[in-house]
């Protein structure tokens, strides 16, 4: 973690992957967030028939960890510090992490199935 002017910064490396049917998903590659602030990771996908949309986290040297998922008939799902927003019309998925912590520094993947 880097410290600058008394602030701690978290680096969320964002990478994307689709876990079935070779569908495409897109998201930004890098996000820097000050510890304690909220962060939003965005993802777009192509398959409007997807039933489930997932967010995974991968810490250095570890395997993928399922953070949360949302059914395609839902608009929002909240679980502790995580909020998932789904706009099925625009094929847009967002993950909001409230009160970011050093343990949130990782690679994040969105996926659809």
UniProtKB/Swiss-Prot annotation:
Pfam families: V-set (PF07686). GO terms for cellular component: T cell receptor complex. It comes from the Eukaryota. It is found in: Cell membrane. Gene3D superfamilies: Immunoglobulins. PROSITE patterns: IG_LIKE. SUPFAM superfamilies: Immunoglobulin. Disulfide bonds join 43-110. Residues 1-22 form the signal peptide. SMART domains: IGv. Glycans are attached at residue 42. GO terms for biological process: adaptive immune response; response to bacterium. V region of the variable domain of T cell receptor (TR) alpha chain that participates in the antigen recognition. Alpha-beta T cell receptors are antigen specific receptors which are essential to the immune response and are present on the cell surface of T lymphocytes. Recognize peptide-major histocompatibility (MH) (pMH) complexes that are displayed by antigen presenting cells (APC), a prerequisite for efficient T cell adaptive immunity against pathogens. Alpha-beta TR is a heterodimer composed of an alpha and beta chain; disulfide-linked. The alpha-beta TR is associated with the transmembrane signaling CD3 coreceptor proteins to form the TR-CD3 (TcR or TCR). The assembly of alpha-beta TR heterodimers with CD3 occurs in the endoplasmic reticulum where a single alpha-beta TR heterodimer associates with one CD3D-CD3E heterodimer, one CD3G-CD3E heterodimer and one CD247 homodimer forming a stable octameric structure. CD3D-CD3E and CD3G-CD3E heterodimers preferentially associate with TR alpha and TR beta chains, respectively. This is T cell receptor alpha variable 5.
